[in-house]
Amino acid sequence: MKVTFKNVKLRKFCESKSSSKKLRVRLADLIASESVQDIVYGKPHPLKGDRLGQFAVSLEGAERLVFEPINAQIPRKEDGSIDWAKVTEVCIVFIGDYHD
């Protein structure tokens, strides 16, 4: 998949040697996947509520790597929800515990 970052600060954090090994592995998993559906590890799941339209994978404890689709045209199912199996471009928007 094509992976971008919401801002330079987030990109630099993800690419730094001080970032966790699990974060780097999850990013590598995203890049190696053809679509969101191909992600196997990290308990991948679509989000709800104020994060509707975003997807997350687990890192450490309650921390998550959160991303959203950026395909030129966001693929949708008949019910209007995002068809994550067809999402091939994502933007990393948040890393941390969104449960707070």
Report each predicted region and the residues it spans:
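Short, contiguous, well-ordered secondary-structure segments
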Residues: 26-27, 32, 75-77
